[in-house]
Curated annotation (Swiss-Prot):
<feature type="glycosylation site" description="N-linked (GlcNAc...) asparagine">
    <location>
        <position position="10"/>
    </location>
</feature>
<dbReference type="GO" id="GO:0016887">
    <property type="term" value="F:ATP hydrolysis activity"/>
</dbReference>
<keyword id="KW-0472">Membrane</keyword>
<dbReference type="GO" id="GO:0005524">
    <property type="term" value="F:ATP binding"/>
</dbReference>
<feature type="transmembrane region" description="Helical">
    <location>
        <begin position="583"/>
        <end position="603"/>
    </location>
</feature>
<feature type="transmembrane region" description="Helical">
    <location>
        <begin position="1418"/>
        <end position="1438"/>
    </location>
</feature>
<feature type="domain" description="ABC transporter 2">
    <location>
        <begin position="802"/>
        <end position="1044"/>
    </location>
</feature>
<feature type="binding site">
    <location>
        <begin position="838"/>
        <end position="845"/>
    </location>
    <ligand>
        <name>ATP</name>
    </ligand>
</feature>
<feature type="transmembrane region" description="Helical">
    <location>
        <begin position="1324"/>
        <end position="1344"/>
    </location>
</feature>
<protein>
    <recommendedName>
        <fullName>ABC multidrug transporter A-1</fullName>
    </recommendedName>
</protein>
<feature type="glycosylation site" description="N-linked (GlcNAc...) asparagine">
    <location>
        <position position="1391"/>
    </location>
</feature>
<feature type="transmembrane region" description="Helical">
    <location>
        <begin position="725"/>
        <end position="745"/>
    </location>
</feature>
<dbReference type="Pfam" id="PF06422">
    <property type="entry name" value="PDR_CDR"/>
</dbReference>
<feature type="region of interest" description="Disordered">
    <location>
        <begin position="1"/>
        <end position="20"/>
    </location>
</feature>
<dbReference type="InterPro" id="IPR010929">
    <property type="entry name" value="PDR_CDR_ABC"/>
</dbReference>
<keyword id="KW-0325">Glycoprotein</keyword>
<feature type="transmembrane region" description="Helical">
    <location>
        <begin position="508"/>
        <end position="528"/>
    </location>
</feature>
Amino acid sequence: MNESHEAGKNSSTNVEEREEEVLRLARQFTEQSSYSTAGQTPFAAEAGSALDPNGERFNARAWCKAMLQMHIGDKEAHPLRTLGVAFSNLNVHGFGSDTDYQKSVGNVWLKTLSLARIAFGQKQRKVDILQNLEGLVEAGEMLVVLGPPGSGCSTFLKTIAGETYGFHVDKNSNINFQGIAKQMAHEFRGEAIYTAEVDVHFPKLTVGDTLYFAARARTPRHIPGGVNATQYAGHMRDVIMAMFGISHTKNTIVGNDFIRGVSGGERKRVSIAEACLSNAPLQCWDNSTRGLDSANAIEFCKTLRMQADINGTTACVSLYQAPQAAYDYFDKVLVLYEGREIYFGPTSMAKHYFLQMGFVCPDRQTDADFLTSMTSHLERVVQPGYEDRVPRTPDEFAARWKASPQRAQLMQHIKSYNAKFALDGEYLDKFKQSRRAQQAKAQRVSSPYTLSYVQQVKLCLWRGYQRLKADPSVTISSLFGNTIISLVIASIFYNLKADTSTFFQRGALLFFAVLMNALGCGLEMLTLYAQRGIIEKHSRYALYHPSAEAFSSMIMDLPYKILNAITSNIVLYFMTNLRREPGAFFFFVFTSFILTLTMSMFFRSMASLSRSLVQVLPFSAVLLLGLSMYTGFAIPTGYMLGWARWIAYINPISYGFESLMINEFHNRDFPCMDYVPSGPGYTDVGLNNRVCSTVRSVPGQAFVNGNAYIESAYSYTASHKWRNIGVIFAYMFLLGAVYLVATDFITEKKPKGEILVFPRGHKALKKGKSDEDLEGGGGRSATVEKIGSDGLAMIERQTAIFQWKDVCFDIKIGKENCRILDHVDGWVKPGILTALMGVSGAGKTTLLDVLATRTTMGIISGEMLVDGQPRDESFQRKTGYAQQQDLHLSTATVREALEFSALLRQSAHVPRQEKIDYVTEVIKLLDMTEYADAVIGVPGEGLNVEQRKRLTIGVELAARPQLLLFLDEPTSGLDSQTSWAILDLLDKLKKNGQAILCTIHQPSAMLFQRFDRLLFLQAGGRTVYFGEIGQNSQILIDYFVRNGAPPCPPDANPAEWMLDVIGAAPGSHTSINWFETWRRSPEYARVQEHLAELKHERRHQTNLFRTTSGQKREDKDSYREFAAPFWAQLYQVQVRVFQQIWRSPTYIYSKTALCVLSALFVGFSLFHTPNTIQGLQNQMFGIFMLLTLFGQLIQQIMPHFVAQRALYEVRDRPAKTYSWKAFLIANIVVELPWNSLMSVLMFLCWYYPIGLYRNAEPTDAVHLRGTQMWLMIWTFLLFSSTFAHFMIAAFDAAENAGNLGNLLFLLCLLFCGVLATPDQLPRFWIFMYRVSPFTYLVSGMLSVGISNTNVTCADNEYLRFDPVNGTCGEYMGSYMSNLGGYLADEMATANCSFCPIKETNVFLGRVSSSYSDIWRNFGLMWVFIVFNIFAACSLYWWVRVPRDKKPVAKAE
């Protein structure tokens, strides 16, 4: 900015005068606009005018002025408000250290002990992050915050915006938001916002819908211009998209790192646009230009400048690699050095402040880079003679600033500002009035939200519908799966007879129906965790309450739940011949539906009460087990142990089951189908001397009363039918309230400040810094200039030339073909550093993907040759590709990641030790020695951005690429010093003969000059220039000027100038078709000639070499797809996966908790169950309930596997590091030892409490049968883990695989012989009984558990009747000899008490189980395990392994 503008800024201390001046200028601009906008409003603009956001002539400044004028002219519109901030004595600290130790299964308890010590009063180490910051940013001003990573820039911005999680603001710090202080964090939360560096959006929502939602959420109560809220939000969306050049992405999904959507730069602009639509008067932007090209970075700053000038918005922005044009838009600058303030003041004076101190600014270095260089002793240049006079350490710089007259003047301004805007004064009242006028009438005055709660819910409902339309797969698969399950259950219990023979089957049917309806929404937990970060971001922006989104999702799910209740329950009810009465049917459907809603609230509240998925899974599994076991069927109420009976009282499912049982049995008499005694010799016995073989039967009656049956068997009372419905409703509302409240107040787990994490036993090397800060996690790294040539000695020298001609790439969007790359030509030679540049979305990353053969979709055409020969299948592993996203295994160390790449990607003939030594050289070369043994971690707890980028490049260098190195945005997100260090590294590699093709955004003039050649693309993937850059970019500049471009100013950055020339920068236009200009140029002709020469010469040389040298075995091996043989791949991958699991204690201990707690719960719920008839039934259900863990076990494995697979498919597979077979087998095998350990724990915690060992005592087989039971539990866990891999192998989402897995799991449970014995199954389903693995599992476990012992009936299980004559023994002798059973007293002459079962083997026979089949069952379980492994591999190969593409065709 010029000095007159700066002076105007600094003199404007009166906010009211400033606002009046802004309004006066707005009126003047509107009246005298040079654009044809007279008589137009922004909402009724002529098509193609400057106010039309969908037209080519749209002008953002003209639109803003017109919008402001319209707002001023509307008396009902809310008053405009602005917000500045003054801060002094600002100190921020955290607790901890700059390093930590990695938690593993073995040492996590040590961490627990340290936390316990802290809880009992042991003080933590205090770490200062920001120290004594002072500054003043008035309304309408822009502040740029400069400093390297780790200097405290992010912490400062978060503090100003009120986001202080993970650190503490000192209580003596003074922050004055123009007369407002404590209210900013709550009442005015959305008025000061922080926009993080990462982009978090719903990936399958379109860009247009994402931004419409944000605009609508901040729509004011009264809208000037006479349009409704929908039109206003739509117009604001179109305007903001036009401002940031993303109008063309309106109907494209946003995507993320794993779901293809808009480009990375476009996604960043979506994040910026979303934040702008919040209309916050104070905006904090944290490195928001990361991933943007320089033109869009400048346009971003220009837009902020426009908002500040016209609307009075205040912006605080941290920038890395800030172009000079972007820096010039700012009024003030804050320079931070390890948390100390070393300058705060006008941007125009900052450079001079350090120059007069004795430092030198190199030629063509931007002001921002010069200021940032002050924080690095390796970068700052001292004037000769000033070596002993300039400050060196952060404290010396801070002390020099404290003593400066500039600081004294700043403190005077802060004092005046605080006096003018006293806290809680009149400006606070004005601010409240303006905010209130904007809010909906139904909104609370103290609420930070604009819309009323009802409006928020409606808006979230709209978004929910858009998301459902975008991805209905989970809903459809759930509905389909539930309908199939209903059909299967109905067919199993098809047309039940209305007599006593179906009593158990009716109970089992209703039990399964209740569980199916109640537990079918368990996967909702996964969805809630996936979207939590997005919703919390929107809450910080004050767009809506998190509970409003939660409430809308409840409503959004209602149509599905209603449809599911109708389709599933109609099929189930009528096919099974449940009570054929209208009232009974509708009560059944109604009860099932409200149970579904209640349990949906249960799952949602569980998810909202916990902060991560791993926290909740084990406990939710035990709760689900409790809900299922204490429903009243598996363990009838009378058999529940006293200490656990309360579980049934707090279990909503038990109330539903009781009501459905009453609904089915109340006031019905069921004819008796089986009498005792009966058969030969008893045909003439009357009813008085025999009894129905059902509980609560009465001698002399040919039926059993339903009320009596459920009262005796289940202790159910008919009067509870509607009472239970009321209880269920109460639970529904209670759990719903818990869900909504917890959603608003409990946030997800966030990372701490960035710290380095080391494996226990490794120590961080001392770094020679005076102070460490939480944010840095390692401080500044030196440039690679200090590394000598010795580190380069082992770097692979390359000789091959890679060339491409007429490369095109087309994808299908809808029904239309879209061309992403259009006839691109070029080459990469050893020792040449080639830059690939273009506007965001021009296809740079796509071109790298195509050239590196990493695309998995679309149609590729053109010619790509290596030394004149087509690329072979070894091409991918012979090239290095450093991706823009720094994707690494979070649990590995830096050294392990590099060694893994070296061992598997270098030639198999290179000795192992040489590969390890090579990794050591790469570590030295990249200056990673001090953190070589640090854990990679996740952002926030592990390597910082710079360190991750170095590691990404290092992984590719460690592979020793034989052909060339691709780098996608290697300097993205890095500050200028680190970017310069990365270019130092590339320059060293180039000088050693490395061939490099590198995309780059926002290069400074000095950085741009370090490249040799440039491939420049415009939108549509069309070449604008390919050739040398030249000294001071002169060859490039001459080309454009010769073809009609205006001259490049001497002080301009050629990288920014050329974007303006071709009209790629937002707001810039050109009448020249630069693509056609290039195609007609002599430079293009020379490129074509050289490509033909290269093809002929290199092909001839290659063929000659192959003919004269012959083909050695090593040469043949070099053309293999993978460098390492399969067994070497498997070994290395297996070691890494074992390390990863060991270093994931939350995964292992949640698995342990799941198995141990569930086993204990089942075991002690059935503690020492007696061998009565119901006791045997309970023991059988004890096995059955243990098997229900299957669902939770596979749900735990699937998300873990999906994360590993995403990393493999995005990084390791395209690099041909190892094969998919090694990946899949290693992930399956790694579960084996842990499942073995879990089986032992589960066996001990379940087998002995139930008391099954007592059944082996009569035959003296306690140890044998105990071992057999453990083997069956072991195979169950192995089957579960392999089945999980089988399910997830083909699916992208764990939710879809979970739905299918639950469907198959339920089928296994249904057909295992517990709920319906083989004799009761329809003949059609017998094959399912035989193919269900649970058939053999239950049969084996049940026979081992209860065989070969006697049964003792409980008192209510005896059947009582009088003999015809004689004793009971004489009367029942014939019957007992044929059908078994025993009498309590054979000598009794009246009231015979008969027990139908004498031995447990009879009970086993009824469920087709026999102890003699135990080893057959064990063997068959292994058959199923092997089948799962084979099916997982087959499915993965069929669905997810890319097929070899046919030879490319010539593009049209």
